[in-house]
Each structure stands twice: as structure tokens, then as C-alpha cells.
């Protein structure tokens, strides 16, 4: 929201900047686009950037500003589908977009919470279909950002009282979040 506000208020323009914001497809897709020069800047998970740089030493991409000091990575579920805490994922269907930053951290989250990942059925989903699939009951929970998944579910008519948010940072995953 701050970036759109800055465009709307003319803040970028007054500094001589012509800024265009394009929809992203997750941190794992944004980082290589910056590294290859397709985009001059991106908004991505710092942990995904560290992993990318480990796999691509010398890649010309760096973080210049932390935006989230606590990542919004979450498992967002529906209480009516039995998902309220990490252990509830065992036996559940988890919708996860492969390039999602929260999904990238799921193995560490699962380990920190002693989850038997063999008991979690993972359904690869797209970003646009993630929350609709949860709202329709096709999955029991999804990986995503706590605030955007919550707002998307509310917009789709899921009652607030039925939405559960398992913030990974509150369950053993102590990481920084997104950076520019």
C-alpha cells in the first residue's frame, strides 16, 4: 500500500522517478527477475534472497531496505475444517503456491513444530486460486501472508470467526521478512 500511495500522491514523480508496479508471482519469481535485470527493484522475502545468492554466487542482486522485521508468513486455515494450530495440519490438505515465500519456509516451520510432513497432503495451487480454494473447501489451509490471505478470505465471504491464522513467527520461525 505505501508504494501505491506514493504513486497516487505524486511523491515518486516529485523526486524525478517514474515508477510502475507490476503484479508479482512471489519472492522466488521476483528475485531472479531483479538479478537478470528484467526489473530494477523487487519486493521479496530476504530469506529467499539469501537462498538464491547461496545457489547463485555473485548474482547482481542485493537487499537495500528491510520492510518487514517480522515475516507475515502464515498458514491460514478454516476452523470449520479443523485447522487452528500447527499439529492440525497432519491429516489436512494444504494449498501452497510453489513460488510462495511462506511455502519456501514450510520445511523449517514443520521441523520447528515436530510435524510429520508425510501426513500433510500438499496441493500445489496458483496465487489467484489459493484463497478461493480454501473458501470453497477444496483445501483445509493455505500458505501465504497473514494479512493478504485473511483479507482475501473475508472478501470471499468467509466469516472472520472461521479464519485461523498460524503466524510462523509465533511458532518457532524467527526470521526477517521482506526487503526491497
Model-predicted regions and their roles:
Residues 18-26, 43, 117-127, 165-166:
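Short beta-strand-to-loop elements that line the ligand-binding cleft
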Amino acid at each position: 500500500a505505501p508504494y501505491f500511495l506514493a504513486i497516487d500522491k505524486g511523491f515518486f514523480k516529485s523526486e524525478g522517478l517514474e515508477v510502475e508496479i507490476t503484479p508479482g508471482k512471489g519472492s522466488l519469481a521476483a528475485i531472479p527477475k531483479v538479478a537478470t535485470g528484467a526489473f530494477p527493484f523487487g519486493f521479496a522475502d530476504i530469506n529467499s534472497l539469501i537462498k538464491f545468492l547461496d545457489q547463485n554466487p555473485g548474482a547482481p542482486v542485493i537487499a537495500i531496505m528491510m520492510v518487514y522485521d517480522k515475516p507475515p508468513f502464515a498458514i491460514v486455515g478454516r476452523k470449520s475444517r479443523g485447522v487452528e494450530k500447527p499439529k492440525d495440519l497432519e491429516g489436512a490438505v494444504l494449498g501452497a503456491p510453489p513460488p510462495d515465500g511462506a511455502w519456501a519456509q514450510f520445511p523449517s516451520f514443520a521441523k520447528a513444530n515436530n510435524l510429520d510432513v508425510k501426513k500433510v497432503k500438499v496441493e500445489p495451487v496458483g496465487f489467484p486460486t489459493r484463497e478461493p480454494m480454501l473458501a470453497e473447501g477444496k483445501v483445509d489451509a493455505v500458505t501465504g501472508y497473514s494479512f493478504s490471505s485473511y483479507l482475501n478470505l473475508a472478501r470471499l465471504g468467509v466469516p472472520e470467526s472461521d479464519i485461523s491464522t498460524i503466524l510462523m513467527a509465533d511458532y518457532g520461525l524467527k526470521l526477517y521478512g521482506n526487503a526491497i
